[in-house]
Amino acid sequence: MSDFSQNNAILSLRWLLGLLIFSLCMLQLCLTYRGLDNETAMDMAQVARQIARGEGFTTKFIRPIDVWDFSQKAKKSPKEETLDFDHFAEANHAPVYPYILAAAIKMTGYDDFAAKRMDTEKSNIYEGDRVISSVSTIFFLLAMVLAYSLVARMFDEVVAITTVAFMGISELMLQYAISGLPQPFMLCLVLAALHCLISAIQAYQLDKTRNVLLWLGLCFIFMSVLCLTCYMCIWCFAGLLIFCGFYFRPNGMYAAIGVGVMLMLVALPAALYLTPTGGVERKFIYGIFNGFGSDGAETLMRTASPTSIAFNSSNFFLRLLGYTFSQFNNMYVNMGAIFTVPFFLLALFNRFKKPSIQGIKWAVLAMWLCACMGMALFGEAKAISESQLAILFTPCFAAFGTAMVFICLSRMQLGESFNAIRALTVLGMLIISSGMFLFQLPKQLYIGIWTSARGIPHFPPYYPAAMNGKLHDMSKAEEIIVTDQPWAVAWYADRKALWMPRSLSDYTRNLETIFNEQGQKVQGFLITPTSHTMTGSGIAGVIRKAGDFAPLALEGKLLLLTPKHNMAFAELFSTNANPKSTARPLASLVSSQGMYRHRNFILGAEMIYYSREDVSEFNK
């Protein structure tokens, strides 16, 4: 094949691949879309709406631990600090991505809740979700362009097309594209930083010191923005600094510059931002519970007495090492189940001719190893999570793996049949990597076409129409709803929501006291399928998750057995199981004689709102 014909073929493949990936994204966003299903995405969305309204970096999702932290801070300096539940400072998310979402929300008018309320008679999908998913989809498409240019720059266009094809039809990558999470944006930043790093390595090989400083400076800036998008990415930055310290001479000089950039652009803003809730050190300790606490960070976030939760420090470093190696074990799945990803480890033993490829290989390895340690210490085991960093290394791992497969084929002396065998190999790898997704795609399209008029939400546990409609009408903006789904209440109902604590005494003795001191009223309790959906662990899992409020969570399941909904399970809990407890019993809160005695079935027995006042007129 002549060079002209080969260039035309590559150009055609490039356009076909771009059209395929764009079409898949649009199908997800327009035809088979079911709304957001990630609590962090909803939380960031409601914070972004607050920003778009001019309320600053505030939240309507209130965590008990933050109430305790803010109250302790206010007690120490009552003249300087006040606990304002109407403008409750957000201290759990890095600031960059919510501001990007805020721009999208402002441009589309979704900062005005009343003007953009759902028409529950026509749709089950909140269009605000589609706005949030559109932002992540745009960044996903941009990441594909950056990945293509980076891989083509390192190897050639055939490897680039193959790598992007792997990513574009990976089910996990496409799920991230509509997840509303910041990972697609973070992927863009990582790829931009690696572009700068390649230029710095090339300049270093030519002894152009000024250019090395320029490109590394840009690389460090991109990494700083990455850290301000997700604090976990500081581990990636640390890996990059380690690489720079050993690769560039004089050793340590460029790494020291990177440390200075990180301190100025990341550490200082983070310290100022986290000061209201006890500072960076407190958030650091809280974060460790996500990996090493008894039940993860959720248990800690749902308590207003953090001193009562013990941190298991036994065999700390041994467990850290074990959790780190578990990240290696899950590498294939967490990087989209792409066939060539594991071959990156084989590429470590191959010496590439270009110094830039060699340098990037070790830089990516250093960043990934540090990220694995960070995910073991602070992260989660879920494949789709705001703290999952493995996805950021997928393009490089897949590219090096693909290159190694092609190198192995070239060494087999296939002669004129090389291109045909390479094409068949790529096709086979694509089928293996995306077979399940492609197999399910026709069914998803069929369901999407037949349900496109109203849509199917991610129920259980989420049902936006119930919150955007009835719950919003039943509740008041100035009062708080205690719920097991506060991120959804804050986003869909536009109401202040307290994450329901696991301990009854935590609520009645600590939180109620703080609310009374601040003149903040609680208007009711909302129980959703988040608490009572039976998973593999059954009732034991419900009890473990809901804690002392388990009877309230299980009441919905019991009510499903009684057609007239006349059973009140909480009535049985008029005394505490522990005779020494000074907490008020559960029945004093939610029963026929309790403070929140009015039971409202927002979505049958699946979603029950226990209100202080009679709001039955809105439940029609």
What is each model feature region?
Residues 11-20, 212-221, 238-242, 260-267, ...:
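Signature aromatic-anchored transmembrane alpha helix within multi-pass, membrane-resident enzymes
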Residues 153, 204-212, 248-259, 345-368, ...:
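Membrane-interface helix-loop-helix junctions at transmembrane boundaries of multi-pass membrane enzymes
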Residues 154, 193-216, 226:
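Membrane-interface transmembrane helices that cradle and orient dolichyl/undecaprenyl
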Residues 32-36, 44, 415-488, 519, ...:
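Membrane-embedded, lumen/periplasm-facing catalytic core of multi-pass transferases
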Residues 176-177, 183-187, 226, 235, ...:
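Hydrophobic/aromatic-rich transmembrane helices and adjacent perimembrane loops
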Residues 1-29, 36, 255-262, 355-361, ...:
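Start-transfer (signal-anchor) and selected internal transmembrane alpha helices
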Residues 227, 234, 246-346, 435-439:
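Membrane-lumen/periplasm interface segments of specific transmembrane helices
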Residues 242-245, 322-361, 365-368, 372, ...:
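Hydrophobic, aromatic-rich transmembrane alpha-helices
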